[in-house]
């Protein structure tokens, strides 16, 4: 008997009224044979039901091919969906991959911090610990996350 072949499935949970096509297009380009299920206006309660239903039908092997992508412009609502998703994952002996990137803020901020750190190391300046870092226009989503990431590197952070 041959092993079942699982198709890659992305379950997009978006807290906004409309799910942004940006990440769905990136997913389809990276995995052309994938399937995307999108859910909009998702709350923590909704997420628990959706994720629970996505956990079990494919078993542990199929779970490796099922990704949960959490998105939205409201960080608090996204955090609620993430918490509900993580709690739901505890109910199974396996879990799905979870990707969290509210409107690209996490990936953009992480890229900026990684680039800064790489430049500092490349110039022989060492780590960011104790260095002064200014995040320009840092009150938006990307700036807020970048400031937290710089602080986690023990940099002295100023937000303008």
Describe the residue ranges of each PLM region.
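N-terminal ligand-binding/catalytic initiation module
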Residues: 1-94
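Gly/Ser/Thr-rich loops at beta-strand to alpha-helix junctions
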Residues: 17, 73-78, 104-108, 138-143
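Short, surface-exposed connector motifs at secondary-structure boundaries
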Residues: 63-65, 94-95, 151-158
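Extended hydrophobic secondary-structure segments that form protein cores and membrane-embedded regions
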Residues: 68, 99-102, 132-137
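Short, well-ordered amphipathic alpha-helices
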Residues: 83-86, 113-121
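Glycine/charged-rich beta-loop-alpha catalytic/anionic-binding loops adjacent to active sites
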Residues: 91-99, 129
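A glycine-rich, Thr/Ser-enriched phosphate-binding loop motif common to dinucleotide/cofactor-binding enzymes
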Residues: 99-118
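Glycine-rich phosphate/diphosphate-binding loop of Rossmann-like nucleotide-binding domains
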Residues: 119-160
């Amino acid at each position: 008997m041959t092993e079942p072949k699982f198709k890659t499935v992305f379950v997009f949970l978006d807290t906004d009224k409309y799910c942004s096509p940006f990440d769905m297009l990136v997913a389809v380009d990276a995995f052309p044979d994938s399937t995307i299920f999108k859910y909009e206006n998702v709350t923590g309660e909704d997420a628990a039901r959706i994720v629970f239903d996505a956990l079990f039908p494919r078993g542990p092997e199929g779970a490796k091919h099922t990704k949960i992508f959490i998105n939205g412009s409201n960080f608090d609502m996204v955090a609620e969906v993430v918490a509900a998703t993580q709690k739901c994952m505890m109910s199974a002996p396996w879990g799905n991959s979870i990707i969290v990137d509210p409107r690209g803020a996490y990936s953009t901020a992480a890229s900026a911090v990684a680039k800064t750190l790489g430049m500092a190391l490349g110039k022989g300046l060492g780590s960011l610990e104790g260095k002064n870092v200014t995040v320009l226009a840092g009150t938006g989503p990307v700036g807020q996350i970048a400031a937290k990431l710089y602080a986690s590197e023990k940099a002295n952070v100023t937000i303008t």
